């Protein structure tokens, strides 16, 4: 189910504070976060946020088309290594 429209979008407090501080100073620097559940809001546009994927932080530049999505959608946690090859020699 989607989040109720009565509620505000979820953004972690520490992440929101960092973004507001950078907007006040009008600086652009990479913000490191583990909060994959935070929703992208319009004040984040133009910032680079390094999102944790379970192993490392992936830097993602926030654009206006990303507003309303979650940060975790842009940092995949799994890497597809390919399907196992079928060994035809062992079947004979």
Curated annotation (Swiss-Prot):
Subcellular location, record wording: Plastid, Chloroplast
Keywords: Chloroplast, Plastid, Ribonucleoprotein, Ribosomal protein, RNA-binding, rRNA-binding
GO cellular component, one term: mitochondrial small ribosomal subunit
Any one GO BP annotation for this protein: translation
An example molecular function term from Gene Ontology annotations: rRNA binding
Record carries keyword GTP-binding: no
Main location: plastid
NCBIfam families the record matches: rpsS_bact
Homology family: Belongs to the universal ribosomal protein uS19 family.
Function of the protein: Protein S19 forms a complex with S13 that binds strongly to the 16S ribosomal RNA.
Protein name, per record: Small ribosomal subunit protein uS19c
Taxonomic source organism: Calycanthus floridus var. glaucus (Eastern sweetshrub)
Lineage, top ranks: Eukaryota, Viridiplantae, Streptophyta, Embryophyta, Tracheophyta
